From Swiss-Prot:
Residue spans of biased composition, Polar residues class: 9-26, 45-55
Gene Ontology molecular function, alphabetical: metal ion binding; telomerase activity; telomerase RNA binding; telomeric DNA binding
EC number: 2.7.7.49
BP GO terms, sorted: telomere maintenance via telomerase
Main location: nucleus
GO CC terms of this entry: chromosome, telomeric region; telomerase catalytic core complex
Family note: Belongs to the reverse transcriptase family. Telomerase subfamily.
InterPro entries: RT_dom (IPR000477), Telomerase_RBD (IPR021891), Telomerase_RT (IPR003545)
Protein name in UniProt: Telomerase reverse transcriptase
Segments for region (Disordered): 1-66
Organism of origin: Oxytricha trifallax (Sterkiella histriomuscorum)
Amino acid sequence: MSAKKPVQSKLNIGNPTIPVTSNRSTAPKPVPGQPQFVNQEKKQQSQNTTTGAFRSNQNNANSGGNGNFELDDLHLALKSCNEIGSAKTLFCFFMELQKINDKIPSKKNTELIKNDPQFQYFCHNTILCTEQSYDEKTIEKLAKLEYKLEYKNSYIDMISKVIKELLIENKLNKLQTFGYKLVNNEFGNQNHLGMMQQNQDSSHNSNFMVKCDYINLNKQCMITKNWEKVYFYLGDHLFMHIYKEYMIFLKTRDESLVQISGTNIFCYLNEKLGRLQAAFYEGPNKNAANSAAQGSNPEANDLISAEQRKINTAIVMKKTHKYNIKAADESYLTNQEKGFWDDQIKRNRLFYCAHQNRFFQKHILNSKTLSQQQIRDNIYKEVFGFNRVRAELKGKVMSIIEQVIVNQKKFDFKYYLSKNCPLPENWKNLKKSFLEDAAVSGELRGQVFRQLFEYQQDQRQISNFLTEFVANVFPKNFLEGKNKKIFNKKMLQFVKFNRFESFTKISLLNKFRVNEVSWLSFKCKDENKKFFMNENEHVFFKVLKWVFEDLAITLMRCYFYSTEKAKEYQRIFYYRKNIWNMIMRLSIDDLLKQNLKQVEKKEMRIFCESQNFAPGKLRLIPKGDTFRPIMTFNRKIPNQVGKFQSRMTTNNKLQTAHMMLKNLKSKMFKHSFGFAVFNYDDIMKRYENFVQKWKQINSPKLYFVAMDIEKCYDNVDCERVVNFLQKSDLMDKEYFILNTFVLKRKNNIIVERSNFRKLPIKQYFRYKFQKIGIDGSSYPTLFEILEDEFNDLNMKRTIIVEQEQRKKFPKNDLLQPVLKICQNNYVTFNKKQYKQMKGIPQGLCVSYILSSFYYANLEENALQFLRKESMDPEKPEINLLMRLTDDYLLMTTEKNNAMLFIEKLYQLSLGNFFKFHMKKLKTNFALNLQKIGCTNTTQDIDSINDDLFHWIGISIDIKTLNIIQNINIKKEGILCTLNVNMQTNESILWLKKKLKSFLMNNISFYFKSTINTKQFANITLSKLYIAAAEKYVACCQEFKRFHENTSLGGQNIDIKIIHIIYVVIRSFFKYLVCNVKSPVFERDDYQQFFIYSLKFFITRFKQQKNEFAGVYKILKAKEKKLEVAKIEFQIQ
């Protein structure tokens, strides 16, 4: 739809723009098979774009008077909340005032605004909100009052006066009152409630004095030149009213909102959080007073107790009562959708179980303390909970459980296991041979690991073992005919699932013919048939859930070890316990030689109890001819008192120290301390700057080097890390920790821009508490912290409120628990206890920062020569060195620098007792490794990259520095990264979100003209679409199965699938054009982009033509139509 013509307003405030010269390389020659987009040279020369946050607000002023185009997602969500009366920018507020009184702002002030682009930007990025109960006519009355500036020379006094009035009126839930309290000169320092009772008359207000307990930085946000200008434009009455009654939000560079005045928006999320907020504002004294008052009134106590009992009962019923059919006309699907998460098969218990135990040794089926009848009743209660089932069906289910209890004791597990999942042939001799080879040398030991890792069990064999167990243990009439075949296929699918995939109720019951299950048969009148069918589906699902979630998973845990593999993403591999035991035996021998020491359980327990730590868990990940040890610290710390303390883990305990170290991490990047980068954004910032400098010196030849540290975390010297942290100039002696409320937009709730409806705020936002660490020597506002481009906070699409006084912590106090756990790290592995003697634990939340900081200190001394650069065209010298954890990349114009870099790092490793993977050394030139003392005399030919240089998933063109994303475009490689887990509630939105996530996941820098040309951007685009189409089809299959029996079935399913493709292609193009700075594509490329995108979906759906014939035909027809018809891209 085209944009409506903007309404003209008397106040003509333009949108601020900063002209930027576009620096683009010459377009490459056309590549066969790739789309040729429209040349936009003329448009490119005339177009002025904005930088940074200016660009994101490019459309803010386009609407003139109606203001609809100002609404970004957060702004629109606020406007759509029941608790919010109105939400408008300061710019729109000025326009509405002029309609009421054209003297506010005055003509003179209007001209000043028009000539002040910084103030214009401020107006567009300040949002004013009212509460639901606010009377909008109040502004009209105030606007017609006489314009006054009584506080022209005392603006701060006016701000203080408003705060005092709020305190007197007892409006303590306003952010303006944070840190302030009233003191009565006559009565001394009393509590606020007592003063209000004694001073109801306004004549006593002069007796009050405002005392500051701590600095209110929300107030500081108002003491700026821009707000002082707003005061001059509005006058006393309007400005004081806005500051007193409105909720004011400032938009940050990440499109988030910081609230600086008004009722804390966090109060509106729900009643519970409102009470928490009230307790925070009013303090413990009021609660004590209320308790005292209630104690003197027994009747009030009885009433409160009775009400509280009702609430407690309701909470218990909500937790226990999951599903109950009470009437024949109840919709099963509706009930099913309400309890989606309760109706998912849980698989977490399956993974990483290394214990060698017998089947059901501790299972209730083999309980020695309970009778068979008690076992049956307990299983039934566990499966069905409090749900009612008709007596006849309940008896049949009880009978099935009884037969399982008896038959599983007769089942020959060893026979069926060896029949379906045999060990390698001649395993006993192989085992001896492997142990002998592993003891000889490192190379042979690596071959042994590689061979053992290849003995993974075939998934179909495991599925056959499980289905034979069910066939022999359950009654013969449990599943028959086609239902039995469907069950076998479901079991195979269950075994093949990726790490985070599972069955939902809909996906599990799909294709089963429940009416053909003999033990679910019933006789009834036609009018009651629907009731019994719904009940049968529910019971059948509960029984299947018990089979998969309890029996099948327990069986697999007993006989197989389930794990991921390195570079296999989320694909799961199964090993017989006999094989995995040997892998663990060889692995722990290696770890004991490297960095572990076996200790007694008593020693570990004494340390953990005295220091309040929980021991970590160690597991292994297969990795080629070796293994990767993974430590996790998710165990709860024992003997902790309190609701939150009882759930405390080691990583939770280090959270405050983590905030301090994240501050250190930001400083390392900001001040270029060492050469560490921490994510792809850091990499691309430095890479883009380097590309610009390289082009300025006429693009000379570059020399590339990539190196990899061996066992990066294990080789960190803990004592030296402590020394570096204590002496570093990047760390302050003290740190402030901010506690903030964060409201995060729910991605699955979309606000209709054309016709939105008011909903409770909890429908649009979810909450969390976020801690932020800042230097103790500074005291910036929350807005200033978020505006810092080097901040390490993920605060996009959020509303943030600072909730309490900042707490100061000495550096040494924060570091103490980090140092203790690093120097005394205890882990458990295969029922044994170990202490880490070298390096830092890899699974701690702070480990990645400590590791990077350690190697950064070593780099600072050894690699200073790479900081010397020259932009002289005759003899240029520029260098780019980055290290992401343990992976180095050097790009330099001088070959000597590349050679010296390798030599320096090699010597650095020898002097600090760590190693590099010299076999993984990669360059784009030949070199003699013997010169720097390496044992290898020649370099491997495969390690020399001539055209594309590969580093951590990025391929760099050596001649042009264009980049391509490395994506595995084979079907197997694509699907191993997919987790379908279909959301049955809002399934259409789920499918749309899935396709968006396949395309728009951290890919913006591949489509920036400052880095890439269209030729290379199109290569990445092709890979993205190949992978996205493959994953989308897999999701559409689940989507179609779910809707086969719903109102969306038939042709409507195809239309929804196609509609989502169209919407997401348009959103993707909008993202690449509007959200990417200096984009490769222009708006006139839209039609060619759309046609090109469709081809990938047409190709993939053609392969599934039998299942998606309608989708393929419509997409093909759309493609032909677009070849003739012209479409335009317009932002709505």
